[in-house]
Amino acid sequence: MDVAKEKELREAEALMEKNVLLTSIDKVLNWGRGHSFWPVTFGLACCAIEMMAAGGPRVDISRFGYEVFRASPRHADVMIVAGTCTRKMAPLLRMIYDQMPEPKWVIAMGSCASAGGPFADSYSMLTGVDKIVPVDVYIPGCPPRPESLVYGLLQLQHKVNHPDKVRLLKHGK
């Protein structure tokens, strides 16, 4: 009787190995998050024009699942800071970031958002939005091409899908 039960159990395990996908729930959630970013619109200067062009038919970021730009930060999980950020705009940037639900990511698009750009020496400019919010991906250029934004989104997707290979920092700390 025990031999028959063991044989039946082995057959069930073999069948399960062929037909059942075993994974952790985090991997499944990260896969879903990485393939359906919902960016909040936060265009500040000329980089915002390139961000809008990325949604057009020539580049078409919707083929990657990123076409849903949200007007409300409560419905977004990615903030794309596109352009020059002044010191007066910094508290609003932080407020919008704080309104986004976890998990959330930030992309600094362009030289101005990354390091201040040509206005870095100005009294009213931030020398990078990473002084206000934690930035996950930097996209260089003045302004960067729409293809660069697609590349940055794909880098963020890789970062989300492989948190064990890429160190993700906990936001807000």
From Swiss-Prot:
Catalytic activity, EC: 7.1.1.-
Localization per record: Cell membrane
Principal location class: membrane
GO BP annotations listed: aerobic respiration; electron transport coupled proton transport
Amino-acid positions noted as binding [4Fe-4S] cluster in the UniProt annotation, renumbered to this chain: C46, C47, C112, C142
Disulphide bond pairs: none
Signal peptide (UniProt feature, chain positions): none
InterPro entries in UniProt: NADH_UbQ_OxRdtase-like_20kDa, NADH_UQ_OxRdtase_20Kd_su
Catalysed reaction equations from the record: a quinone + NADH + 5 H(+)(in) = a quinol + NAD(+) + 4 H(+)(out)
Domain of life: Bacteria
Membrane topology: Peripheral membrane protein
Annotated GO CC locations: plasma membrane; respiratory chain complex I
GO molecular-function terms, A-Z: 4 iron, 4 sulfur cluster binding; iron ion binding; NADH dehydrogenase (ubiquinone) activity; NADH:ubiquinone reductase (non-electrogenic) activity; quinone binding
UniProt KW keywords: 4Fe-4S, Cell membrane, Iron, Iron-sulfur, Membrane, Metal-binding, NAD, Quinone, Translocase, Transport
Cofactor note: Binds 1 [4Fe-4S] cluster.
Cofactor(s) required, per the database record: [4Fe-4S] cluster
Role description: NDH-1 shuttles electrons from NADH, via FMN and iron-sulfur (Fe-S) centers, to quinones in the respiratory chain. The immediate electron acceptor for the enzyme in this species is believed to be a menaquinone. Couples the redox reaction to proton translocation (for every two electrons transferred, four hydrogen ions are translocated across the cytoplasmic membrane), and thus conserves the redox energy in a proton gradient.
Assembly notes: NDH-1 is composed of 14 different subunits. Subunits NuoB, C, D, E, F, and G constitute the peripheral sector of the complex.
Protein family membership: Belongs to the complex I 20 kDa subunit family.
Protein name per its UniProtKB record: NADH-quinone oxidoreductase subunit B
Species of origin: Desulfitobacterium hafniense (strain Y51)
